Amino acid sequence: GIEVIDERFRELVSDVSEVRRHWKGAEWSEGAVYLPEQNVIVWSDIPNNRMLQFDPESNETTVFREPSNFTNGNTIDREGRLVTATHLTHCVSRTERDGSITILVDRYEGKRLNSPNDVVVKSDGTIWFTDPPYGILSNREGEERDSELEGNFVYRLDPETGDLSIVADSMDRPNGLAFSPDESRL
């Protein structure tokens, strides 16, 4: 069964809904996001260096991108484009409508990011992401190397100006991000 913690969940899922497994085969899955224009759910399978997509109409799971550069977190921006945190290329990128990939940020003050992990887009269009060391600790989910930064941070990126700022610097290994419904809390 489904345990409902927040009653607003019932606005999304009916009482007769059931949880079903549609696919198995990922070593571990991260960053699931629904792409409404394509009507697919995309997610990362980090150690297998690929992204997968599930099509609810055909009930099929296929490869979305391989290799994926050890992608982790995914979300969509206000225009419905896929925004991805990537370990191997130490960046946050955006998949454009034509399928090309734009690197939005890969450095802070000239130093390579560690391994962007999770990412969310606020209603004002800013992109917030975590940058722990997971993807630089071994070659299993990125590239083993020393960090160029003095810590592991949560960042805010303004995609219009390119301005990148640290919004949290006291966490050892920041991971998942979400805003409260009114965006007053991260």
Where are these regions (language model features)?
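Sequence-structural signature of mature extracellular/luminal beta-sheet repeat domains
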Residues: G1-L186
